Amino acid sequence: MDSADPQLARFLHQLQAETQRQKFTEQVHTLTGRCWDVCFSDYRPPSKMDGKTQTCIQNCVNRMIDASNFMVEHLSKMNGGSA
């Protein structure tokens, strides 16, 4: 059983890494969808992204990240942890 422990640990580490990658990908898709809806009112991609649209997307993503970080910090404090 001892020889299986390193294999199990390696497998669990790989599983955790893959789960994190999937969560990150899901968050990117969510941000893309929400910010697309906010910044592209006609739902069509422009032939060239202008400065106004680029700024809108940057601000949208930054606000979503800020909100996510705020929620994580708040939940951590509620659970007695420190952020």
From Swiss-Prot:
Concerning InterPro entries, the annotation shows: Tim10-like (IPR004217), Tim10-like_dom_sf (IPR035427)
Q: Where is this motif: Twin CX3C motif?
A: 35-60
Q: Which GO terms describe its biological process?
A: mitochondrion organization; protein transport
The answer, when asked if Zinc is one of the entry's keywords, is yes
Gene3D superfamilies reported for this sequence = Mitochondrial import inner membrane translocase subunit tim13 like domains
What GO CC terms are in its UniProt record? mitochondrial inner membrane
Disulfide linkage: 35-60, 39-56
What does the UniProt keyword field contain?
A: Chaperone, Disulfide bond, Membrane, Metal-binding, Mitochondrion, Mitochondrion inner membrane, Protein transport, Translocation, Transport, Zinc
> What job does the chain carry out?
Mitochondrial intermembrane chaperone that participates in the import and insertion of some multi-pass transmembrane proteins into the mitochondrial inner membrane. Also required for the transfer of beta-barrel precursors from the TOM complex to the sorting and assembly machinery (SAM complex) of the outer membrane. Acts as a chaperone-like protein that protects the hydrophobic precursors from aggregation and guide them through the mitochondrial intermembrane space.
* Descriptive protein name: Mitochondrial import inner membrane translocase subunit Tim8
